[in-house]
A protein has these predicted regions:
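Short, flexible loop segments at the rims of nucleotide/cofactor-binding pockets, characterized by
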Residues: 59-65, 137-142, 172-174
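Soluble or luminal CAZymes and related metallo-dependent hydrolases
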Residues: 47-51, 142-146, 235
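Non-catalytic C-terminal accessory region of glycerolipid acyltransferases
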Residues: 1-24, 145-266
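A generic secondary-structure micro-motif detector
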Residues: 45-46, 114, 172-173
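Catalytic core of membrane glycerolipid acyltransferases/transacylases, capturing the structured
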Residues: 78-140
Length: 266
């Protein structure tokens, strides 16, 4: 709570705020990513991936009991692979996204997460490593070759790829935050659309936290523009759509003046 409040006051809306997140040195990231690349083709990795995906499938069904999806008509005619973007407010919000996409007829989705998540402990760490995830990193060598190859491979398999353009998770934060350009750069590079989502968080009672997924208009890359211009245009369009969805969902103007109600449960 205090970290989010401070980040908002400093206008650092994409910064890391969760106190429990692993903090890794460069050499630690190197070791984690090298191990991930070597291990992912192993039998042990495949077994753990199978188990994690089975757990995630069951969890997605459970999340569906408290999740409503609006705007599925915006996805009519979308059969091809695509990149999905969504506001990031929980380590398990990917289950909400997966439920919404399942309702739209998509059954396969890969989830991009931070390389530091590979170092997480316990159940959440297990799911972050094995539940059809792929790490993104600040390391240049990884982002130049390995990461684009992972994205391309998933899209070639006709999967959706979930990328959080807000970059960092802010737990239970309601407002959309500015989008980084990466998701849209890959959409242009691989000529796939962006499925734009905004998740509204609702509190029905003290113990019941529910969700409404707003499926927004699909954003297509403009092939007449150069890569940078096209990706920036998609980036701005997506952020504007998410901001408009916030206003519609909560019935209030979007500002980044901090209020207690910006965080569910406060």
């Amino acid at each position: 709570y205090e970290n989010i409040k401070t980040a908002v006051s400093l206008n650092q809306l994409n910064s890391k705020v969760e106190p429990g997140d692993p903090k890794l040195l460069r050499e630690d990231k190197e070791a984690l990513l090298r191990h991930y690349i070597d291990y992912r083709a192993s039998y042990g990795f495949c077994v753990k991936k199978y188990i994690a995906e089975a757990i995630f499938y069951a969890g997605t069904s459970a999340v569906g009991l408290i999740t409503q999806v609006d705007g599925l008509k915006n996805l009519s005619g979308i059969k091809e692979p695509a990149i999905v973007t969504c506001n990031h407010f929980s380590p398990l919000d990917s289950a909400i996204v997966r439920f919404a996409m399942r309702k739209a007829g998509f059954t396969r989705i890969s989830i991009v997460n931070q390389d530091t998540n590979l170092a997480m402990k316990g159940f959440v760490g297990y799911m972050q490593r094995y539940a059809d995830t792929m790490p993104v990193s600040s390391l240049k060598w990884f982002m130049q070759t390995e990461f684009p190859n992972q994205i391309k491979s998933a899209l070639d398999e006709n999967k959706l790829v979930l990328i959080y353009p807000e970059q960092e998770m802010w737990f239970n934060y309601r407002k959309p935050r500015p989008c980084k350009r990466g998701a849209y750069l890959y959409a242009v590079k691989f000529n796939v659309p962006v499925i734009s989502l905004f998740v509204e968080q609702q509190v029905k009672s003290t113990h019941l936290h529910t969700f409404r997924v707003h499926v927004l208009p699909v954003i297509y890359p403009d092939r007449q523009l150069d890569e940078r211009t096209a990706s920036v245009r998609m980036q701005h369009t997506d952020y504007e759509q998410k901001c408009a969805a916030y206003v519609m969902a909560y019935g209030k103007k979007l500002t980044y003046d901090f209020e207690e109600g910006d965080i569910v449960g406060r």
